[in-house]
A protein has these predicted regions:
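Solvent-exposed adhesion/ligand-recognition segments of exported proteins
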Residues: 2-214
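Extracellular calcium-associated, cysteine-rich motifs in secreted modular proteins
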Residues: 210-262
Length: 270
C-alpha cells in the first residue's frame, strides 16, 4: 500500500530530546520506572520534573527546558497537523505492509499485531485528523524491511498515546500524555503533557552522544567561560548560578559551578 509522499518537518531544538514533556506553564513531568532512556530528557514549566526509579538515563536531564524548545515542539506539532493525508486507514494494521507516505486515521487508532515498513521513508502517521483521537497500541510491533531508518517514522497524535507490551518504532508527537509500559521504543517521545515510562527501553532518535543547537546541558566542572562554555556560577548551586535558566548571578564557583549553557553544534535534525 502506498500513500502520498511528504517531507517531514523539522523538530528544531525539540529534536534534541529522546523524551520531552512540553506541558504549558505548569506540570511538565517525565517519570521513568524500571526502564532505560538513551538520549536527553526534558521537561517544561515552572514545576518541571524528571523522576527516575531504577531508570538509568544516558544523556542530559534538563528541567525546565528553554522556551525555544517548547516553541519548536509546538511549531513542529502544527506543521505535522497541516500535512495533507495520502491514504486513510482503519483497523489494527496487523499484518499490513506500508511504503513511505502519509497515512491517516480520522479518529482514534487501536493497533495490534505487526506492521512492516518497506523502503527508506519518510513515513508519517496521523491519528485523529478529525480533531480528536488517541493512539493505543497493545502487543503492537513495528518492523523495518529493506534497510529503513526508524528515525524517518513519525506518529502525530491529536490526543494521548499509550503503548503496552509493544516494540515500537518512530517518533511520537502527542497532543496529550504519552504512556509506555513494557517493551521497546525506538524514537523520540514528545508530548504536550506528561510522559510516563514503565519497564520500557527507550532509544532516542538518534541515540544522543552529543548535543545539538539550542540544547541546554549542565556544566560539569568546567572553568567559567572556559572549554565547556559555561558562565561563572555559584558552585553546586543551580538556583543561583549565572546560567541560561534565569537564575541570579552568583559568586564564581570553583571550576565554574553548576550553570548551564547552550551547545553550539548542529542540531541532530534540521
Amino acid at each position: 500500500m502506498a500513500a502520498l509522499a511528504a517531507t517531514a518537518p523539522s523538530l528544531g531544538t525539540a529534536g534534541n530530546f529522546a523524551v520531552l514533556s512540553a506541558a504549558p506553564l505548569h506540570g511538565g513531568a517525565v517519570t521513568c520506572t524500571d526502564g532505560t532512556i538513551t538520549g536527553n530528557v526534558g521537561s517544561s514549566g515552572l514545576r518541571a520534573s524528571v523522576v527516575q526509579t531504577s531508570c538509568p538515563i544516558t544523556g542530559s536531564i534538563v528541567a525546565p527546558v528553554s522556551a525555544k524548545v517548547v516553541a519548536d515542539f509546538n511549531s513542529a506539532y502544527a506543521a505535522y497537523a497541516a500535512i495533507p493525508c495520502g491514504t486513510f486507514l482503519t483497523g489494527t494494521l496487523a499484518g499490513a505492509t506500508l511504503a513511505p507516505g502519509v497515512y491517516c486515521f480520522t479518529a482514534a487508532a487501536t493497533l495490534t499485531g505487526t506492521l512492516t515498513l518497506t523502503g527508506s521513508g519518510p513515513w508519517i502517521f496521523k491519528i485523529g485528523t478529525g480533531g480528536t483521537g488517541a493512539l493505543t497500541g497493545t502487543n503492537f510491533n513495528v518492523v523495518m524491511a529493506g534497510g529503513g531508518n526508524p528515525c524517518n517514522v513519525t506518529w502525530w497524535v491529536a490526543q494521548a498515546a499509550t503503548l503496552t507490551d509493544s516494540n515500537f518504532i518512530g517518533t511520537i508527537l502527542a497532543g496529550a500524555a504519552i504512556t509506555l509500559t513494557r517493551g521497546t521504543f525506538h524514537g523520540d517521545a514528545l508530548a504536550k503533557a506528561a510522559v510516563t515510562i514503565t519497564g520500557t527501553a527507550v532509544t532516542g532518535c538518534p541515540a544522543t552522544k552529543g548535543h545539538g543547537e539550542g540544547d541546554e546541558v549542565h556544566c560539569n566542572q568546567g572553568v567559567g567561560n572556559g572549554p565547556e562554555g559555561c558562565d561563572p556560577g555559584n558552585s553546586n548551586n543551580h538556583n543561583t548560578s549565572n546560567d541560561e535558566l534565569g537564575g541570579t548571578p552568583g559568586d564564581p564557583g570553583r571550576q565554574g559551578g553548576n550553570g548551564t549553557h547552550h551547545a553550539t553544534t548542529a542540531s541532530k535534525r534540521k
